[in-house]
Structure formats: structure tokens, C-alpha cells
Amino acid sequence: MSLLKNVGTIGGLTAVSRVFGFVRDILVARVLGATPMGDAWQLAFMLPNIFRRLFAEGAFASAFVPLFNRRMVEGQSEAQRFAESVLSVLLPILIVFGGLAMVAMPWVVAYFAPEGLESDPEALPIAVMMARITFPYLLFMSLATLVAAVLNSLSRFAAAAAAPILLNLCLIVALIYGASLGEGVMARRESAFWQSVALSLSGLLQLVWLAFWMHRAGFRIRMVLPRISPGVKELGILIVPAVFGAGIYQISRFVDLFFLSTLEVGSYTYLAMADRWNQLPLGIIGIALGTAILPALSRYLSREENEEAQRLQSNAIELAMLLTVPAAAALFVSGSAFTRVFFAGGAFSLEDAMITGTVVSGLVIGLPAYVLIKVLTPNFFARKDTRTPVYTAAFSLVVTVGLNIALVPRLGVLALAVAGSIGAWCNVAMLYVILARRGFFRLPARIAGRIARIFVAALVMGVTLWFLMQPLDPWFGGTTLQRTGGIAAVTLTGAAVYGIAAILLGVLDRATIARLMRRQT
């Protein structure tokens, strides 16, 4: 399939999941709000997900896919033995790590808990209990990541892209039940408890779902006795630096947790809710592109088809910018409109929504950079180079932490968003310079010119939306009809202006679409 079709498959299913995710977040805002129990749930939800994205999705997939593809060239039986040996070692590690985390959870939660939660003698033990309930999600999703990596290597992208829908459905059911309990502290506590149970259950369901489709694809991974094979050793060597290279975003989240613990109650919720808007295009575009190009790059480089690898990388960057730059511009200008329309109500006040909207604007400054990291790092991983992204990630992290120290006392939670965005752009700059100096990739002047025109088209759209936001501002906090009309006007106007500007500037034409639709082999 072509890059555009693969990204469309992954991104389309991810978009469905994100829609359910927004329904989930609206319910979370209405049921829990920016309260101590809301922060407790966000912390219990963040902890296993940070480890999942850091070790399972980012590091594991980046190291596993090139090694698996190399063995697929030798034959499926060789690839199957490799996957089985990896599973035999991965499962005991996950069990031991999960057990240690369960024991240490009171100290972990107390360390990361915000001041208002830490000082609450009743809320803190509940937060610890919730975190323990949610942590098995890491075990299930790490195993699911192994199965998903196999499916993606076989170019079966749909099943893995659809799996997160199960997560959101489980949480929505739990939240609907929580909403039926009424208002008050006790109702919020019970709702948060059932959300924790639903999270772990969703991990098990996703694992079963992916295993079913792997079997349908004719691939089996059997349980065998643990054995440190040469392939497992090589995978382990690649994973350690990949944790930092592919997981810089998640490492930054640990930094965020530390600084959030120094801020007022509600800050966890503000950042989490704002990040949902940042994650929407990042998940649909960035993760889809990174997932789609890694197997293809691995195949091209194993066959020494360097020109095809260069073409694929250029197309991926152009497509990433074509989609993320306007999304970032639109959310930067109108982020507060979206947070007021979708989140304000119930336990989540209009002031909470306005603060969240400000954080959205800070986060999306780095949206194109986060996507470019997803697009550029596979070029290293496909060459089995997981060390170089370590250095760029470390530099980016130093920049982020330094900015947090300087800005958090002045800007509060907004500083975390801005610092992370600037750090991400530093990461992108270093990744590209290193690729260019090593002769692995250099962006063609033609593509660079098109990207410049993309920024111009997005700027035209952003200015238009800025003028539109002022007369529509009262609508975003008005009746349901006014909110719907206001957000529809912003969305449709932004899409129309960007589309027209892109066509007039030559960003979108038939030749570009045909090039992006070209089949990968």
C-alpha cells in the first residue's frame, strides 16, 4: 500500500478512537472535574500509560520491528522463533516490575501527588489504591505491543490502530455508571474506582483482540521457556537507548509530574485535558506516520534501496507538515473555544476551561515538532541505531528542564507546555542535522519550498480565525446551540481558508497527491 493509504488506515481508526476519547474526557470533566479526586484519577491513569509509552510502544517497537523484519526475510519460522524468545523474557520482566511497582506505589504516588492531594488524609490512600488497580494495564499493553509490532511488520495496521477504541469504550461505560451515582465526594470516589478497574480490563481486551487478528494473519507466538538468545540480547542492547530516543515525550511527562506536584490543585487535570487536544493530531498523524514508515524503511535499507528510503522520508515529512501545521495554528488561536465548548460544565467550571485552553496554546507550539520526531527517528531505528536519538533526547530534556525551572514560578502550568514545545523543536533540529551530516537524509529544496508555503497558508488561516474569535467569543460559553454553532463556524472557516490558501500557493495539487499515493514495496 502507499504511504498515504497506510497513514489513512491507521489515522482513520485512530481518529475514531480519539472521538471516543473526547467523549470520555467530557464525562471525566463533568463527573470528576478539577478536584482532588480528579487529580487522583489523572495520576492513576498517567503512571501506567507513561511506562507503556516509554518502554512498550516507543522503545520496544522501535527496536523490535527492524530485527523482526530482518528475520522475516529469512523466513516466517525464523521470525516466529525470535518473537517467542522475546515473549519468554519479556513476560517475567513485566511481572517482576509490576510487583515491585505495586509495593512501591504509596511512595510513588506521594512523590508525584500535588500538594492538595498529598495533604488530604483520605484522598491519598484512594489514589494509591487506584494506581495499584490500573498498573496491570502496563502488563497487558506491553504484551499487546509485541503482538501489534508483529502485525505492523506484516503490514496489517488496522487491528492495532483499532485497539484503543476498546480502551475508550470501557472507560465510557464506567463513567456513565459513575454519572448515575449523582454528585458529591463519595460519588466521585466510586466513579474513579470503577474507571481504574475499567482501565485494566481494557488492556486485557486489547491483548485478546490483537492476538485474534495475529492468528488470523497466520502467525503464532507460543510460550516457551525463557532463554537469552542472540536475538534477545541484540533487542535488549537496542531497547536501552531507544527508551530515551523514542520516549523523549514520555520522559518529559515524568518531569511534568514532578513540577505539577508543586502547583495548585487542578493543574494535573488542566494539563491532561489540554494534552487531549494536542494528542488528537499527534495520534492521528504522528503515530500513524511513524508506525507506517518504520517497516517500509527497514525493508528498503535491508535491500540497499537508499533512494526509495529517501523518497519515503521526504514524503512523510511533507505529509506531516501538510496536516499538523494548520492543526497547530488553529488550536493555538482557538484552543480556549474548544475547551469551553466541550469541557465546561458540571464539576469543570468555565474558568477551568479557560485555563485549559491557554495550556492548549502552549502545547501546540510543539505539535509539528512532536510529529517530526515520530517521522525522523525511524530513520535511525531502521538502521539499528538507537543510540543517536539518546543524545538528541538528552539535550532536549536538559532544555525542557531548564525552561521549567525558569518559567514555572512565573507561568505555572502553562510553563510546562511551552518548555516541552521548545525542547521538542531542539530535538528535531539535532535529529535532522545528524541525518544530513551522515548522508542518510537531506530534505530536497523542492519539498522545503512546499513546507514554507504550508506555513504561509496556515498563517493566513490563523489570522482569519483570530479575527473570527472575537465576535464569536460569547457563543462559546452560551447555550448548546450557540456553542455548536460557534465551534462549527471556527472549524469550517479554518478548513476552508487553509484549503483555498494551500491550493492558491501550490501546496495541494494532483501531482502531490499522486506522489503521496505511490505504492510502497
Predicted regions and their residues:
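Membrane-embedded alpha-helical bundles of multi-pass transporters/translocases
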Residues: M1-T521
